Amino acid sequence: MAKETNLVRRVSVKAANKNIQSFNSGDTVNVFVKVKEGEKERVQLYKGIVTKIQGSGAAKSFTVRKMSAGVGVERTFPFASPALDKVEIVNVGKVRRSKLYYLRALKGKAAKIESELVSSKAE
């Protein structure tokens, strides 16, 4: 059984997407998703707040929530998905929960998350 576990671990490490920075729940992120339309493939931007991160290894995924025309839209992305081009962190949110389900009931400015002051490492 130990050999099977090691094999699964090695495969999940190879499947890990290297273009994803580490982020937490409450962070505002830009998710660049590869979309195939007919023969063409383009990259589409999906910007929102990370509401949850779940799973581990190759099954790890995260959910991003955004407001589109006044309607809340949530989309779940697997970390190991080949459709993910890259993930950029826009703001680091200051939250005390790992699952932000309470944002679903909030509207307007109440649904905003306070951001931490982050020093840029430009040098």
Swiss-Prot record:
Keywords associated with the record: Ribonucleoprotein, Ribosomal protein
Domain of life per record: Bacteria
Family annotation (PROSITE patterns): RIBOSOMAL_L19 (PS01015)
Single GO molecular function: structural constituent of ribosome
Disulfide bonds: none
Pfam family, one: Ribosomal_L19
GO biological process: translation
GO CC term (a single one): cytosolic large ribosomal subunit
SUPFAM superfamilies recorded: Translation proteins SH3-like domain
InterPro entries: Ribosomal_bL19, Ribosomal_bL19_CS, Ribosomal_bL19_sf, Translation_prot_SH3-like_sf
Similarity comment: family membership: Belongs to the bacterial ribosomal protein bL19 family.
PANTHER family: LARGE RIBOSOMAL SUBUNIT PROTEIN BL19M (PTHR15680:SF9), RIBOSOMAL PROTEIN L19 (PTHR15680)
Function (record text): This protein is located at the 30S-50S ribosomal subunit interface and may play a role in the structure and function of the aminoacyl-tRNA binding site.
Name assigned to this protein: Large ribosomal subunit protein bL19
Organism: Bdellovibrio bacteriovorus (strain ATCC 15356 / DSM 50701 / NCIMB 9529 / HD100)
